[in-house]
Amino acid sequence: MEAALLNIVQKINGYLSDYILIVLLIGAGLYFSIRTRFVQVRCFGEGMRRVFGNINLHGGKQQGGFSSFQALATAIAAQVGTGNIVGACGAILIGGPGAIFWMWIIAFFGMATIYAEAVLAQETRVVNADGSVHGGPVYYIKRAFKGGFGKFLAGFFAVAIILALGFIGSMVQSNSIGEALSNATGVPTWVIGIVVAALSAYVFLGGSHRVAAWAEKIVPVMACLYLIGGLVVLLARIRFIPETFGMIFRYAFQPQSIIGGSFGFALKQAISQGVKRGLFSNEAGMGSTPHAHAMAKVSCPHEQGVVAMIGVFIDTFVVLTMTALVVISTLYAGNGILASGAAEGVSKTNMAQLAFSSIMGNTAGSLFVAICLMFFAFSTILGWNFFGRINVEYLFGKKAVPVYSIIAVELIFLGSCVSNDLAWELSDMFNQLMVIPNFLAIVALGGLVAAAARKGSRETLKK
């Protein structure tokens, strides 16, 4: 029964990811790039200043809301997950080094999409009498589509995100933690599961502010740790860096030398893997991160929109690219063990471990990857649970949140102990189903986004 269901879900996922999602999300990226006059280029510097150079990002939090930096940290906590390590490796393994080029392309256009999502989340958020803030796709979906159709789409999105991220998604993330740490240290997965579940429960019980507080501490630490480790490897392989970039660009259009097969099939794999992994890594257009950006206290929606763009930049152009450079420079370039294209015995789960271990040594490399996976997966659990929580409140009210949190904690423990392919596939399916109502809403409200971009640009010029 499970095998039959797994087969059905895999076929659904294949159809959704290869046809519907690629068209919708690339289309959204192109559409909003044009409507905002390529805001990801024009306002990139402004976004960087607001994240790294504007001191009021770390203060000015309103009651019930987040500072702009906390909102970004919470979004990045969800964006930067195991996909930045395992997902990048999978794309390279199947699509060749050229897949990374297509990841960059999709991230570039995704920056415009996530700008739109953040702007709409700010425009439609609700501030209650007690100061608490609620916002996210369910609110701008109802703004875009009035009446019963809008309520149906909002409800559909809410159910999908609760299942995809709050429940099944957290389960598969904890599985990554349990497997990685157990393999590196020998500690039983059930022991690791207890610790992860207990830490998760502590953060969940503290509400949205505790999630944001942990996110703004964990995200900088985990990003710096991973980047420092990656730089160590790249310095050791520095003479192969030009070749590494050359392979990324060359095999983006001529990938058959890496993975074999016909030219057409190889090119399709390179593009398909780059696009899919890129979309799922930075989450632009999926409707997850707007929940965090809605919470920020800013002067106008445009301000949080440009901050949101930097989240995609950090996720793809910094963290995911570091994984790609480490893997390609050690395993493919020069005398790399996969230079000949033979990938027997290598999987996406051990590819990063193999790459780091080639420079750091087996023990240190395995432990480093395990620790980074732990940080990435745990931060994703926190972000995803928060996104699910908002939709639970939307559907069932605040009284349902404790029940939601208890179920989530139980699944986190279970996920760390039991590996289930069906759980991974179901998570992917509901994740992809989230995109459809979110896409329809953001495109329907494209005029609102364009107006916010124009107004924000004028205000920036005045300052």
Region spans (language model):
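Transmembrane helix-loop junctions in multi-pass membrane proteins
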Residues: 4-5, 35-40, 83-88, 166-178, ...
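Alpha-helical membrane segments and immediately flanking helix-loop junctions
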Residues: 59-93, 120-123, 129-138, 142-144, ...
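Extracellular/periplasmic helix-exit of transmembrane alpha-helices
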Residues: 116-129, 231-247, 255, 259-265, ...
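Flexible loop linkers connecting adjacent transmembrane helices
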Residues: 38-66, 90, 96-97, 112-148, ...
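N-terminal alpha-helical transmembrane segments of multi-pass membrane transport
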Residues: 1-82, 92-99, 110, 413, ...
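Helix-loop-helix module between adjacent transmembrane segments
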Residues: 32-33, 106-131, 138, 142-175, ...
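Membrane-interface loop-to-helix entry segments
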Residues: 24-31, 35-48, 157, 174-181, ...
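Selective recognition of specific alpha-helical transmembrane segments in multi-pass small-molecule
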Residues: 109-117, 194-208, 219-239, 272, ...
